[in-house]
């Protein structure tokens, strides 16, 4: 908490006159703590400050080394504070804090795109899509790029890779990121990757499908998992082959050998049973990776959907981006 408070204290204060009753770092401290507790509106922040008034003042006294004698700030106070806040300065402060946490808890970076369906497009070319780099370990967005069309996602992924530090980290991207240039960039920056393969890479997909057959059964490592909750039972079976390029002479690869630092290939079979509807669905997907640990790949593929379940859900439902 000391670290985030010190960084929030660097945000410039735009307020003037009688609007300076409450220090800006105190208002930001309440807002940050409130958001982490599920409070999202100005009225929510006022309520949160009232509910935890003594604790917040004691925390502020410990962090800022000064005491507050005022009553709790109103919703108008929070509104005025944030209306004039420099978004770039606030974003830079947040990134500074995020990087300190990222060095400790970062390793898995999920990259995924999202359409902001609730935006009112005054211009057909206005930016209504985002591509985000999300740190699964701390449930926070590391960086994002806004684009006007979903077809520009590939370039947006490349742009993200230019600005984020991927060294020593593992990147998971869906099929849109399975491009030779993207893999080359990840490897050149000393990162690892797990990428989904679909029909946008037909040659690679065909060669992957040909490997998971009885001919290679002795080479296949199987990792299984089961989860139950929300009225569903999901089973996952990951079949993995390590160092597939050792079969290059017999297979005469045309596509598989173009992926830099390829160490493993994977077939994931997911079965989901809906207890209420009594319906079972089956999905098969393929992946390429620079990792050689099947259990780790299985876990990271599962964790990749944290960007959908945690980030996108919050943006859509709590912040109303799809309204």
Whereabouts are the PLM-identified features?
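An anionic, glycine-rich sequence signature occurring as long contiguous blocks
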Residues: 198-302
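Short, conserved beta-strand edge motifs with alternating hydrophobic and charged residues
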Residues: 194-196, 286-288, 310, 314
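Conserved, well-structured functional cores that handle cations and Mg-NTP chemistry
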Residues: 2, 7-10, 17-181
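Catalytic-loop motifs flanking and including active-site residues across diverse enzymes
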Residues: 26, 283, 311
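Nuclease catalytic cores that cleave nucleic-acid phosphodiester bonds
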Residues: 140-218, 222-231
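Short coil/turn segments at secondary-structure boundaries
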Residues: 93-96, 221-224, 311-317
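Short amphipathic alpha-helical "interface-anchor" segments enriched in bulky aromatics
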Residues: 291-323
């Amino acid at each position: 908490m000391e670290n985030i408070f010190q960084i929030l204290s660097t945000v410039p204060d735009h307020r003037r006159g009688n609007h300076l009753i409450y220090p800006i770092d105190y208002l930001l401290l309440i807002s940050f703590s409130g958001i982490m507790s599920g409070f999202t509106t100005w009225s929510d922040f006022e309520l949160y400050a009232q509910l935890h008034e003594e604790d917040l003042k004691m925390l502020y006294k410990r962090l800022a080394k000064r005491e507050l004698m005022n009553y709790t700030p109103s919703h108008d106070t929070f509104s005025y504070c944030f209306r004039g806040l420099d978004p770039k300065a606030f974003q830079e402060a947040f990134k500074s804090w995020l990087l300190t946490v990222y060095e400790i808890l970062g390793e898995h970076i999920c990259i995924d795109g999202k359409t902001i369906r609730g935006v009112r497009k005054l211009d057909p070319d206005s930016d209504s899509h985002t591509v985000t780099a999300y740190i699964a370990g701390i449930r926070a967005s590391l960086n994002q790029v806004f684009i006007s069309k979903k077809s520009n996602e590939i370039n947006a992924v490349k742009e993200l890779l230019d600005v984020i530090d991927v060294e020593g980290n593992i990147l998971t991207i869906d099929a849109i990121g399975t491009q030779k240039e993207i893999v080359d960039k990840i490897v050149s920056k000393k990162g690892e990757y797990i990428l989904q393969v679909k029909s946008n890479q037909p040659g690679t997909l065909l060669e992957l499908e040909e490997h998971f057959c009885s001919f290679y059964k002795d080479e296949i490592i199987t990792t299984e998992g089961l989860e139950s909750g929300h009225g569903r039972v999901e089973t996952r079976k990951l079949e993995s082959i390590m160092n597939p390029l050792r079969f290059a002479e017999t297979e005469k690869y045309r596509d598989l050998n173009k992926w830099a630092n390829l160490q493993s290939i994977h077939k994931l079979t997911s079965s989901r049973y809906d207890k209420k509807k009594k319906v079972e669905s089956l999905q098969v997907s393929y992946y390429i990776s620079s990792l050689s640990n099947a259990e780790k790949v299985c876990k990271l593929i599962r964790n990749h959907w944290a960007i959908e379940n945690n980030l996108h859900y919050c943006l859509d439902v709590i912040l109303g981006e799809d309204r």
